Each structure stands twice: as C-alpha cells, then as structure tokens.
Amino acid sequence: MEDFIKGLAERVLEGEKLSKEDGLKILSIPDEYLDLLVQEASKVREAVFGDEVEFCSLINAKNGACSEDCSFCAQSSKYPTPINAYGLVPKKELVEGAQKAVSIKANRYCIVTSGKRATKEEVEQIADAVREITENLPVRVCVSIGTVDEEDLKLLKDSGVDRVNHNLETSERHFKNIVTTHSYKERLETIKTVQKVGLSTCTGGIFGIGETDEDIVDLASVYRELNVNSIPMNFLIPIPGTPLEGNKQLTPQRCLKIISLFKLFNPQAELRLCGGREINLREYHDTAMEIANCVMAGGYLTRAGRAPGKDEEMVRRLGRKLITGRDLFSKYKTAV
C-alpha cells in the first residue's frame, strides 16, 4: 500500500491517467496512510498551481420555489423546508454583492439563481448587472443559473461573464436516485454548450448523498474527460425536510480521500472547497487546503459559512498567496 501511494504524484505528473481501479484503491486506503496520500495529492497541486489560492463568493440572487426535486436541496418546492422564497433581486443588490465579494478579497463572484433555468428576462437583467460590475470592480463574474442555451450564454459572455457553474453532482448511475425531474444527460449537455461558446467551466459534486466509491471515481473520471476548469467540492449538510435529512455526515478522513482522488484525477483543474467544508472537515480543514487551491468564502446559498477572516488567516498560516484583482493563476509550472 505504501509503495502504491508514494508513486501516485510521479505517475500523474508524468502524464499518466490513473485507472478506475487506482481510484477505488485510493478511496479504500486505510486511515493510517492518509497523511501520505495527502502529501502525494499536495505535490500535484504544488507542481501545477504553486502556492496560489483563490477566494470566490456568491450571491443567492433568486431563492427557493424550485420546480426540481434534488434530494439534498432546501430550495426545492417539493419539500417542506423552512426557506424564504424570493424572485431575482434587483440590479442594485447584484452590484452590491460584487462589492462585498471584493471586500473579502474574492477574485470571483458568482450570481446564483434557483430553478431549472432562468427566464430570458432574468438572463437579460443579470447581463445588465454584470456589465456594470465588470466595468467598475476588480472581480471576475460567474453565473449559476441552471440549464442554459447557447443564445443566453453568448449574451452573458458578451456582458462580461467568463465562467459558468453547472454541477453534475454525482455519477450518471446514482443521479436518478437523487434527482428525477431532469436528467444527467441534460446537465452534461449544458456543460458541453458552455464549452462550445468559449466560457470557462465550473462543475463539481456533492458527497455524502448515498454514493458508492464507484460513483465518486466515475464522477472524477467524467470531469477529466471533459477537461473542466474548476471543480467545486461540496459535502452534504443534511437539511430537515429533505429526503436526505437522515444521512450521516462524512468523516473528515473520508472527505480527504475524496479530495485527494479528485486532485490526482484532475491535476489541471482548480479544486474548490465549498459547501459543508467547515462541518465535515472540522479540524482537518487546513489539511484539505494542502490539496485544494480555491475556497468559497463568505457563506453559501442557504447556509452561513465561517468568517472570511478565518480563511485569510488559514492562507497565511499555510504560507500560501491570495490572487485578487481579476488575476488568473500563474502559468502552470509543469505540463500534465
């Protein structure tokens, strides 16, 4: 086992694509070897991204009343969750959200709306706000607005959006157990359309939703095939009223194995610690940042996060460097 782990970073950095069997073996590594696994994943992060870290921040621009039945989500209208539903917030609030993002040193600001897809009018309103933001504030703008077509993506791109978030969440096999109101294929086609119009892709998963090791490896493999730019890692916080309210939290050790797997399978992708990171990683949060190079700061859609100052302290403590002012990560130190 030790020999297998010690060779992982070298294999990846030499251009080898780890196999499904490798992935399953990584997830089954005994906890006593976890430090060694983290070291290998960290070597890959450092070789590709160096010591740079990016904060991103979001605004919950339209909340609740969602027609979809994602089993983990508080915003679905199918479940009796205590949520304050509201329509798309006005332009002023979208711009103020970007100002707040800049104030906490976020380099990216994501406008997120509930629902299967945004209406044409909503897309136009978002594009109008994005123009003002990109003209006046040093922050990159992303959107997460559900299923979106090529026409709307081109409008958003022209307004200044440079990245779109659309998560596959889990494997194709497990997806139907989590969502029934739309298909995995539909989400996959949206991601491919985003790539077709030349926008950056941010697409990740949520873990702790009843998936198997095979589901996790399959998702990491799909993102490798798609060559996505950013992978947000979310960990379930069971929400009362949703079908997954009784799910057990993942252990920090399990989370670290998943994060390591995604880094080793997707060395060129930004790895972004997002929802549930504080509760699930607990005292291993700094350890996870040895592997990741991005953090969702300032809170999530329906849950508060930890104070942004704590994340900044963590970056300093680890000897890492924040990128701000619309900077991109420096040129990769190695080609993978």
Swiss-Prot record:
CC cofactor:
[4Fe-4S] cluster; [2Fe-2S] cluster
| Pathway stated in the Swiss-Prot or TrEMBL entry | Cofactor biosynthesis; biotin biosynthesis; biotin from 7,8-diaminononanoate: step 2/2
**Catalytic activities:** (4R,5S)-dethiobiotin + (sulfur carrier)-SH + 2 reduced [2Fe-2S]-[ferredoxin] + 2 S-adenosyl-L-methionine = (sulfur carrier)-H + biotin + 2 5'-deoxyadenosine + 2 L-methionine + 2 oxidized [2Fe-2S]-[ferredoxin]
Q: Which Pfam families match?
A: BATS (PF06968), Radical_SAM (PF04055)
Q: Which domain of life is it from?
A: Bacteria
Identify the residues that bind [2Fe-2S] cluster. Answer: C110, C142, C202, R272
CC cofactor note: Binds 1 [4Fe-4S] cluster. The cluster is coordinated with 3 cysteines and an exchangeable S-adenosyl-L-methionine.
Q: What is its EC number?
A: 2.8.1.6
Which keywords does the record carry? 2Fe-2S, 4Fe-4S, Biotin biosynthesis, Iron, Iron-sulfur, Metal-binding, S-adenosyl-L-methionine, Transferase
What are this entry's molecular-function GO terms?
A: 2 iron, 2 sulfur cluster binding; 4 iron, 4 sulfur cluster binding; biotin synthase activity; iron ion binding
Q: PROSITE patterns, from UniProt?
A: RADICAL_SAM
For the biological process aspect of GO, one term held by this record is: biotin biosynthetic process
SMART domains per UniProt: BATS, Elp3
- Give every Radical SAM core domain span: 48-277
Please tell me where [4Fe-4S] cluster binds in this chain. Answer: C66, C70, C73
Query: What's the family?
Result: Belongs to the radical SAM superfamily. Biotin synthase family.
List the HAMAP family: BioB
Function description: Catalyzes the conversion of dethiobiotin (DTB) to biotin by the insertion of a sulfur atom into dethiobiotin via a radical-based mechanism.
**Quaternary form?**
Homodimer.
NCBIfam families recorded for this chain? Answer: bioB
Name of the protein described by the UniProt record? Biotin synthase
Biological source species: Persephonella marina (strain DSM 14350 / EX-H1)
The gene name on file is bioB
